[in-house]
Amino acid sequence: MPLVDPVTMSSSAIVKGAVAQSTSTTKSTPGSQATESSTTTAGSSSSLATLRPVQIKQTPAAQTVRHALPAALTALYLLRFDALVTNPVPVMLNALPVVAAFQMTYALLCLPAAGEPASKSNRKPRPGEKKKGGDIGSSTIITALLASVLTSIVTPFLYFAMVLFGAPFLTHGSHTFLCAAHLALLTLFPLFYVHGVDSAAWAAVGGFRAPLDETFGGLVGGIVGAWLGAVPIPLDWDREWQRWPVTILCGAYGGYLLGRVLGGTLFWGKKF
Amino acid sequence: MSFRRNGNLSSTLLLIAANVLIPVAIVIFATGFFPYKPLLPGLAQYEPLDGYGEPPEAPFDKLVFMVVDALRSDFVYTTNSGFKFTQSLIRHGAAIPFTAHATSPTVTMPRLKAITTGSVPSFLDVVLNIDEGDESSSLASQDTWLAQMKAKDTGKLVMYGDDTWLKLFPGTFDRADGTTSFFVADFTEVDHNVTRNIPGELRNDDWNTMILHYLGLDHIGHKGGPRSPHMVPKQREMDGIVSQIYKAIETQDHLKSTLFVLCGDHGMNDAGNHGASSPGETSPALLFISPKLKGLQKNQDSPLPDAEDFQFYSTVEQSDLAPTLAALLGFPIPKNNLGVLIADFLSIWPKKADQAYLLHENARQIQTVISAASGTKTFDGALPAESCASPTSDYEQLACEWQGPSNNLMSARVGDDMDSQWALPVVTWLRKAQELMSGMASNYDMSRLILGQITALLAVIFSLSAAIKTVSPTRSLTPLLVISIAYSIMMFASSYVEEEQHFWYLATSTWFGYLTLRGFKRANTTFPAHLLLTAFPVLASLRLLRAWNQTGQKHAGTPDIVKLFIEPHPHFLWLLVGLTYFWTHRQLVYSFHGRIPVPINYPVMTGLVLAAFTFKAAFTLEDAPELVVEFVKSSLLDFTRGASLIARARAVFVGLGLVAMAAMGFILWEMRGAGGNRKRSRRKKGPAEAITTLQHLYTILALTQSRTANIPVFLIFNLLYWFLSSEIDAPDGTGLSTVELGISSLLLQYASFFAMGGSNAISSVDLSNAYNGVSNFNVVLVGILTYVGNWAGPVWWAFGTVVLLGEIWRRDQRQKRLGSGNNGKRGSDEKEEEAEAKQMLEGGQISPFKTYVAVTTLFTAFSVAAVMAACTILRTHLFVWTVFSPKYLYCVAWSLVQHLVINVGLSGLLFWLGSF
Ligand SMILES: [Zn+2]
Ligand SMILES: [Zn+2]
């Protein structure tokens, strides 16, 4: 069984930094983020055109935000947990803009916007040249806005997917929808920011063939976490937090943060 | 090559060993877990008690015993009850009310056993309750108060109502009219058949015992729950009968010493079902009624406000009825009784010596039971004081504690002056003995439990190594192992056992989500189109299945598709039902196409499907008339008016049998043709297609045995089946592998069981179709019909899997031929195909059927071992009789019937037939 399907391979697999592909095949580690390293291919299948793992920007601001935001999200979650249990809908609704701001900051400061940064650095691969820190140009902001629009478009579909996997359909509509919105904001927004609407990239993500990085790790973690969140619901402990959708949201946040941290460090560049 | 063959042989042997060990383990464990309780034989006689005179005179000589099935305590005692007359009797002291605690399993037969023998029936009585014709459940040879009343020879025994009594006491009743509860939609006729006998019998003076057992109230519960609009009118009807009998006792001279007992055999839960041990189910009402009882001056308040726990007045054990009746009617206490004489009645006997006699007789009888159980003669002489300082067993402890009560009885006998509470220590001691003897924990045979456990673990090891040897690459077993291990862990939590369906639903959706996503790799469509056209229909089908019937304990009775969309819209239901039958008809005709000429094929299949459809309509008209729409009634039923349900069902079964035989005939014919004459044309169908005929015939059987509201589920099954089939035919070798098909089949078998309303509770066993076409009880037939009625979905998937396995097998052969580049010559093609088939069967290559068996065996071994471990470790847990024992019985059904008989036996036969 071939690992990569001929169909996908031939048609549209994208290469971020296609120029560099032939020049460098050394495996990079997330620690050595010189300019070149962002152009190297990851993984052993360098002969195939594949998706590269996303590099976090090297600016001090990006590195700070990268570590500070997961902590801030965790703090926010723990702080609002009791309120979430008693009053899920308003709490989730109010938290949504805060989480959106967090994710927006994260994307703008840490992530390469769709297409642009990688190609920019590829066009002038001068060794030793430091990329200008935090150059949030108008185009990146537009990318971020587009990504948030895409995220909100995809939220109803995510809601629908949750219903298909067993979320209540006739009741708890706003609960499930807000939960889907949180999940989309956490896991899909960074991916939209990084990949845009690149169908080949999304095919790789959807087929679980993309290499692990903070964005894809976060997606996998968030989905697995939300999935595992359904496990404690049937228990007869009669706790308030067993109510829909507290455990799902809890699993989504926990899984997302874990997946993002692990995907960005330990498993960076690895594939399933 | 030879290594490969050896590996294949050894894995086959391991697989066989595992499948032999599974039933062995189940039997060994069951004999230790459900021990056979030794019963004292013979009828109790009055034996002289040391120092006492004659047995005290009994205040009553006749008994009217009225059972209202599922009469929960609050139905009689609370403000919104319909029992107004009975409540007035309570206020006047003519009725002494109790809440009688019924132990789990709260189903009729074990409850009647407890009521009549005074003992606690073993859990296996549940199985025998379903298997109603079993001889061993008969009480004809046991000591009961019925046998004692008969032995008194002061009158005849008569019985009107639930024929469970006739099955329990064959030959005991002189006059009887049994009613059956085939159709729970019957609220009135079933009770009218009892009531019409009462006036005549009240005039007769030739009986000393009259049993009445009303089923209507139970039926209303099953149909509409305790708050059904039919409930209070039914209670008023029952109250009217109480009034009728009470007034007869008051006025008629030959009835003046009649004791009238009104009780429920069990209660019901909020959904109107029973079987488990929720407070509602275990709290039936119990009343002793007679004008004579006014003398006790026990006037009590009535009605009472609602109580959450259903405990009203004082609570007694259901088994206490036996010794109390013995005292009140004057006969020896039945030998195996564990009940305690209800102390409220002691003051009927003015003399203390008489009261002491009754208590002492109760104690002595229970001591005999204890001695028999413990195998010692603990109560024969006085125990040495030193052994009482540190008793070695519960029995010894009990014997030591007997000293105090025994002294009290002694003083009461000789007429010493004593305070009014003198009897209390005796009753306390009796209760303690009752508790000890009713507790099951001491009865486990630990060595058998452990031996069964070890055998099951061996089966796990064997099946695991067989699977590793059979399946390549080994890592494709990972999902199966994850499912098996997660399931095993889950078995240790009672709530996960009760809510097992969630595990299968989530696992199935995830697995099929993975399969559909994976399918995108080779799809020629865009991602959204693939999602819309493949992933969405598959996952939506699973979501519909999940919501079809709400099952489990936690949310029992909450709305589901059946309650929200099917029951309120019968037209919609019949549209879907008609579509299901039409679809099956189409497939059946198609599978015979080319074998038999159209002028025969079409009418025969149409007749068969119409017979099945009209049977379903006629059955539903009896079972759930509110679901039958006018159109169905007028067009279909009038068309075949007059045919009885039994005749209709038999017509369907005979038709199915004949067509199945024809299909088998074609298979054998074509097998012979294939062996001798190689020149069968391409257009002619092979046995593989004949197997699909059997599959469609089974679909008709499954429809016949399923509840009407569940029939549309088979349309959903067909959609999922079509998806799996399309996955097999993937062009480039990325299609479904045998292991993946095995996992899909396993998941769908379990998910479909729960989707059709199954659960791990005894109360969810659906008996409504168990007697289709059966007039005289036949254990085998009723057993098969019950199994198909409850496992219709899982068996359907087993059939489907065999057909799909055949598709995989032919696909692999095709690919091998293409791979060897030998696809030029058409003539030798077929020869080779057959040669390869032979080779495959003889072990040159692993047959997909073997891989499938390896998959199901692995899971079955894991589940059996896990359920046994859970039952052993949690054997003293509160839930062992309500959650884990029923789970064990379900696990037995899954592994012995579904796995061994269906997935290995039947599927193996079909695969073998289809592989020629
Ligand atoms: Zn009953
Ligand atoms: Zn019932």
UniProtKB/Swiss-Prot annotation, chain A:
Q: Where is the composition biased (Low complexity)?
A: 32-48
Q: Which GO terms describe its cellular component?
A: endoplasmic reticulum membrane
> Where does this protein reside within or beyond the cell?
Endoplasmic reticulum membrane
What membrane topology is annotated for this entry? Answer: Multi-pass membrane protein
Membrane spanning stretches = 91-111, 145-165, 177-197, 215-235, 248-268
Q: Which InterPro entries did the record assign?
A: GPI_biosynthesis_protein_Pig-F
Pathway, per record: Glycolipid biosynthesis; glycosylphosphatidylinositol-anchor biosynthesis
According to the UniProt entry, its GO molecular function terms are:
mannose-ethanolamine phosphotransferase activity
Q: Where is the composition biased (Polar residues)?
A: 21-31
Chief location: endoplasmic reticulum
Supply the Pfam families for this chain: PIG-F
What does the UniProt keyword field contain? Endoplasmic reticulum, GPI-anchor biosynthesis, Membrane, Transmembrane, Transmembrane helix
Question: Would you say which domain of life the source belongs to?
Answer: Eukaryota
Region of interest (Disordered), ranges: 21-48
| GO biological process per UniProt | GPI anchor biosynthetic process
Q: What does this protein do?
A: Acts in the GPI biosynthetic pathway between GlcNAc-PI synthesis and GPI transfer to protein.
Q: Which family does it belong to?
A: Belongs to the PIGF family.
Protein name per UniProt: Glycosylphosphatidylinositol anchor biosynthesis protein 11
Question: What organism is this sequence from?
Answer: Neurospora crassa (strain ATCC 24698 / 74-OR23-1A / CBS 708.71 / DSM 1257 / FGSC 987)
